[in-house]
Amino acid sequence: MNVFKKLTALLLSSAAVFGCLTGCRASNDPNTLYIDAFEGGYGVKWLYALGEEFEKQNEGITVKINETSDDSTFSTMLTSGRSTADIVFERYPFWDRIFRPTVVGSTTYDPILEDLTDIYNAKIPGEDVTIAEKLPEDVRAYYETDGKYYHFNWAAGMMGLLYNKNVWSSSWKLPRTTDELISLANTIKKAGKVPFVYSLKDSYWGIYVVWAAQYEGLEAMAAYDEGYAPNGKRYVPELALYPGFEKALKVLEVLLKDENGYCHSRSKEVDFTMAQNMFLEGDAVMQANGDWIESEMRANFAEGETDIEFMKMPVISSIVDKCPSITGTEEEKEAKLCAVVDYVDGADGATLPDGVTQQDVEYIRSARSMMQTIGQDHSAYIPVYSTKKDIAKKFFQFMASDEGIEIYVKASGGYRTMFEYDYSKSELQNGISSFMKSTNALFEQSSHYFMPMKNKIFSLTGMQFMENGLVDVEVYLSASNPKDYKSASEIFLANYKNLEKEWTNYLNTAQIGK
């Protein structure tokens, strides 16, 4: 498209990016919409396609896109007042920009992002629905702050456990529970294959938060997200002591423990791309990853050369502790749990074990339906000092329209946003890989779990899940040197102790009174 210009920022330093953006866009043409975009696993073809159609429908408007694999520069440019973009697509909403004013020179912006509430609540042109109504309720609520909206979604980002069907034995069954996942890992080892491969530098084992949520339940996790501890007290270090957090860590401990041999021996040395390719090549049977692996397959493998799929997230076996009607020995409780999972999955001939209550069935049903998503964090914004906010908002409305959604899906090769739409339409399925078809189908069937970490106690302090004053939990759990190893329980306790020691500072930073 001849009116499009690609301002490449790949591999440039922050200083060079600053120079390009401030120099290349010095004219700030009133009819040109400048967009900065992160170019990662989802690519930016969809953005160019949307921009091209937007130009056609808005005579006289030109869209120029600056794409970069280093979106860390976006935040610096925004808060320094040097951003020349009218729209920025990045990977995290950075709530401090909303909760705190930003001073640029002699001007104070509170907040520094443009208020999008008007287009969130207005009918999308040509449709009888609003942007707010097109978003799942949990995502809409995540973006809402004191009745206003400042962020716009641009990806779905499902994560979970993938398995390679090219090396999968027909005698193996997909695990219904974490105990079955561990048993499967043993079976795979006995068959002379490697159960898992990952990169310790960037492991994506963060999916273990789903096991924590399965155990605790959505109500308890919502309380945690609002700063409540298990004892009901708010803004206390005991916030980190939900039992399910330790239970989830214990599952991860078994999977990663060096002496168990469930993970490829090179997992601690390879980078993420290498680990991903090793999985796709069949060097390991399973991997924790996200739907963006599709792009890696397209880039490095011929069509039909790979065959992978997400499994439903296994239910944490210790969930039986929360289900009083599931009784018996540990083996009997696991068997009953598996039977209930079959029942909620709708497996052929599945029946409920005697005595299991409907309340416990629904608790397990909720747990089984959870799949992690990080798409809610893939958000775009308009700098409040942009001089083309009306055009930028119009672009957002177009992107959220049915037409815009279809353009996004087709141009991206099957990826989707969080906006609700009939993604199963045949015209969208044509040309999409079998992996993306199965991924989108599972996405539709699942409840999408994410940990907001939006409350000020998290977003203004940098508080992490189970890693406060610690390095990544995978480093401890996979350590072969006993001096470097920490068990799940040790991590759980150390995280709490570190929070307890610094809690006054956390409260002060978050501006929360006792």
At which residue positions do the language-model features occur?
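Short, low-complexity disordered leader/linker segments with a strong preference
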Residues: 1-34, 56, 501-514
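Bilobed periplasmic-binding protein/Venus flytrap-like ligand-binding cleft at the lobe interface
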Residues: 284-285, 341-414
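Glycine-centered hinge/linker elements that transmit conformational signals in sensory
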Residues: 185-188, 225-269, 299, 308-361
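Helix-loop-helix "hinge/cap" segment bordering the ligand-binding cleft or interdomain interface
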Residues: 56, 123, 143-209, 217-270, ...
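Extracytoplasmic "Venus flytrap"/periplasmic binding protein-like
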Residues: 53, 57-134, 166-176, 278
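Hinge/lid segment of periplasmic solute-binding proteins
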Residues: 95-158, 173, 182, 330-365
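Short, well-ordered beta-strand elements
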Residues: 29-41, 61-66, 86-87, 196
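Conserved C-terminal helix/tail region of periplasmic/extracytoplasmic solute-binding proteins
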Residues: 405-406, 417-514
